[in-house]
C-alpha cells in the first residue's frame, strides 16, 4: 500500500481488534501540533474512524475548534500508516458511561504507508486496561460500533 483515500480491510481489522493504540495529532490554538495516544478507536468503514475522548482533553478542544486530524498507526508486522482527515464531535456524551466522554468521528481523506526500508516495525504501542475501567471500555466500544 502506497497511498489511498481509504483504509484497506487489513487496516480496518487491525484497528478493530480493540488492542490497537494510535497516536492522534491535532492543531493547538497557536498552530502547534498536539499528539496524544488513543486506545478507544474504531474503524466504522473504509472512510470513517471513530474515537472517544474526555471532553476536557486537549484533543477534544482542538477538534471542536479545528477539525484537521492525523492518526498514526504502528503495529507489529512492519505496519506504519498515516491517516489524514477531518474530525468533528459526533456525540457529545456517550450514553454508556457516566464520565464526560464524547465520540469523535473522522472522515478519512488520505491514507499512506510510512514503512521504510531502513528499519522494520516490530511492535506497536502496548497497554493494558486497568481493572476498574474494563466495563467502561466495553461500553465505549459498544457505542462506537453503532
For the regions a language model picked out, list residue spans one by one.
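Binding-site signature for planar aromatic cofactors or substrates
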Residues: 1-146
Amino acid at each position: 500500500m502506497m497511498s489511498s483515500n481509504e483504509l484497506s480491510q487489513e487496516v480496518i481489522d487491525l484497528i478493530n481488534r480493540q488492542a490497537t493504540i494510535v497516536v492522534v495529532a491535532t492543531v493547538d490554538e497557536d498552530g502547534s501540533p498536539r499528539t496524544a495516544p488513543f486506545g478507544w478507536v474504531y474503524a466504522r468503514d473504509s472512510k470513517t474512524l471513530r474515537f472517544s475522548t474526555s471532553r476536557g482533553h486537549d484533543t477534544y478542544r482542538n477538534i471542536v475548534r479545528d477539525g484537521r486530524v492525523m492518526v498514526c498507526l504502528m503495529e507489529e508486522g512492519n505496519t506504519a500508516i498515516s491517516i489524514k482527515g477531518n474530525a468533528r464531535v459526533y456525540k457529545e456524551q456517550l450514553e454508556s458511561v457516566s464520565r464526560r466522554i464524547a465520540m469523535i468521528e473522522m472522515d478519512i481523506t488520505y491514507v499512506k504507508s510510512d514503512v521504510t526500508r531502513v528499519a522494520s516495525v516490530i511492535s506497536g504501542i502496548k497497554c493494558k486496561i486497568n481493572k476498574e475501567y474494563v466495563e467502561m471500555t466495553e461500553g465505549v466500544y459498544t457505542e462506537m460500533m453503532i
